[in-house]
Regions:
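C-terminal and inter-domain tail/linker signature
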Residues: 1-131
Length: 131
């Protein structure tokens, strides 16, 4: 079995940091002008531009019970592909879907991310929290 590519390991470190609420660790794993493309018809869909905006977006996920679990992660010098389960558990909601995330990496840090959920309706329900 071959050793995991360092970019795949960097993605795993970011996912692990998210799970424990360590946004400072995530800050070190993304470039200043990072862009995440979040699909859907929910209020948080769209492009998230910049590290500060991304960290604020991630901070906002805690109250909606968002979670993620990797199935597999592949990487090379420029890209990472993460096959994951993502979902939310909160009062009245217990939903999940499989998601493919494609990342562009530069110098071991995330530059851009695209999410491709298998079930668009479930994906929207994950983020459809009423405040």
């Amino acid at each position: 079995m071959s050793e995991e590519h360092p970019n795949a390991t960097a993605y795993r470190r970011a996912a692990d940091a998210f799970r424990v609420g360590d946004l400072r660790a995530i800050e070190d794993l993304v470039v200043q002008d990072v862009v995440w493309h979040v699909p859907g018809r929910h209020r948080w869909a769209g492009d998230i531009r910049g590290r500060d905006a991304l960290l604020a977006w991630l901070r906002a996920l805690a109250p909606i019970g968002f979670w993620l679990r990797e199935h597999d992660v592949f990487g090379n010098d420029a890209h990472v592909c993460a096959l994951s389960y993502m979902g939310a558990r909160r009062e009245g909601v217990d939903v999940e879907t499989r998601v493919v995330s494609i990342f562009h990496f530069r110098s071991g840090r995330q530059v851009e991310r695209w999410f491709f959920p298998e079930d668009a309706e479930a994906w929207d329900r994950i983020f459809d929290a009423r405040e």
